[in-house]
Amino acid sequence: MQRYISLSVSLSLLSGANALVRPDGVGRLPALGWNTWNAFGCDIDASKVLTAAEETINLGLKDAGYEYINIDDCWSVKSGRDPNTKRIIPDSAKFPDGISGVASKIHDLGLKVGIYSSAGTETCAGYPASLGYEKIDAESFAEWGIDYLKYDNCGVPTNWTDTYTHCVPDNSNGSKFPNGTCPDISNPAPTAYDWSSSNTAQRYNAMRDALLGVNRTILYSLCEWGQADVNTWGNGTGNSWRTTGDITPDWSRIVEIANENSFLMNYADFWGYPDPDMLEVGNGNLTLEENRAHFALWAAMKSPLIIGTALDSINEEHLAILKNKPLLSFHQDPVIGRPAYPYKWGYNPDWTFDPAHPAEYWSGPSSTLGGTLVLMFNSEDSAKHRTAVWSEIPELKDSAEKGSGYRVTEIWTGEDLGCVKDQYDVELQSHDIAALVVGESC
């Protein structure tokens, strides 16, 4: 039996000891940007990418901190590489001026540009990928002006698969994971196996080394779905690393991923962040409350916040969520790298692994908010009360005696709730989340 992460693990473990530190602070804080995939899949072209870049400015998202405009899969000629140079060839029907032409226009707007490849022979959509061509592709990306690489895990040949299987309790790998364990896993690794020596780690390290060898700083986003215990080596390889299979704009999938990622917060700090996948805010049939909870949890976990909706048709409510100043301020804290941690599970006993009901009570210190970030989440399917008790919150409990009061601000509305004694109770609609800044004592 393998356990995803010890459910009694202390959330005070050191992280970042072997972090990938890049010039100019690139990758020190979790990325903010936009990506083509969730909105358009393979149906991409220069016009859609440039429209997103322009709307990032027009809608105030650039001013809010979003800076990367990322091109996902399907940007190249599908038939193969240039027979002479061995370079990947941008699809001229989609990108008449090449990737470099799009990158130049995005840079002229004061933004950065990202590209996609995979650590295999083909991308997930069947386009040429980078395994064995890491140096050539890194050089191409640098010459084109690329600032960000999302590196997927498709097209892996059999000689590059891992000897052992790591437990990732995600629905893409089955459905039976009692409290975060994988009792049915085939070929588990021996105790104390060093996953940094695995074939998966070697494939991703090869591209890391290629990127480090070019004369351009390129943020490196690993997309290998939590395999090969990436949490133990991802911070020395890339700036973020995916922890699960792909997200979808379905509430059940969003809370499943939130649950999985919540057990990995000890790995998040400056220069390295577990990545629960791109945002679905504005997509599918998610309610306003679900969009709000999705964003708040991702921001509190200091996940990369990569928008995945069409910006030229986004509504004001969804845009306001993506631009929420207090949550973005917490997310981009230049002094405190650690994310918010769950301090009470609420619906379940503490440390319960439940894909439908993640931890409901979160808190985190902040140097930018003038207090502690506190989240209360209703994971249930009907309206429920949730109560934040000051003496239960780790950042407050040493000073929160009976009768203690704190000045509290509600994050979604900006309302000053005044001096709140002992606790704060709120009724939340199904799947909604309350977000507070608990400030000075009063």
From Swiss-Prot:
Compartments, as annotated in UniProt: Secreted
Catalytic activity: Hydrolysis of terminal, non-reducing alpha-D-galactose residues in alpha-D-galactosides, including galactose oligosaccharides, galactomannans and galactolipids
Gene Ontology molecular functions: alpha-galactosidase activity
GO BP term, pick one: carbohydrate metabolic process
InterPro entries linked: Aldolase_TIM (IPR013785), Glyco_hydro_27 (IPR002241), Glyco_hydro_27/36_CS (IPR000111), Glyco_hydro_b (IPR013780), Glycoside_hydrolase_SF (IPR017853), Melibiase_C (IPR041233)
Disulfide links within the chain: 42-74, 124-154
Entry annotation: catalytic residues: 152, 246
Positions that bind substrate: 224-228
Gene3D superfamilies associated with the record: Aldolase class I, Golgi alpha-mannosidase II
Pfam families, A to Z: Melibiase_2, Melibiase_C
A GO CC term attached to the entry: extracellular region
Keyword flag Glycoprotein: yes
Enzyme Commission numbers on file: 3.2.1.22
EC top class, as a word: hydrolase
Signal peptide boundaries: 1-19
Residues with glycosylation annotation: 159, 173, 179, 215, 235, 285
Keyword terms, alphabetized: Disulfide bond, Glycoprotein, Glycosidase, Hydrolase, Secreted, Signal
Function: Hydrolyzes a variety of simple alpha-D-galactoside as well as more complex molecules such as oligosaccharides and polysaccharides.
Family: Belongs to the glycosyl hydrolase 27 family.
Xref: PANTHER family: ALPHA-GALACTOSIDASE B-RELATED, ALPHA-GALACTOSIDASE/ALPHA-N-ACETYLGALACTOSAMINIDASE
Protein name in UniProt: Probable alpha-galactosidase B
Source species of the chain: Aspergillus oryzae (strain ATCC 42149 / RIB 40)
Underlying gene: aglB
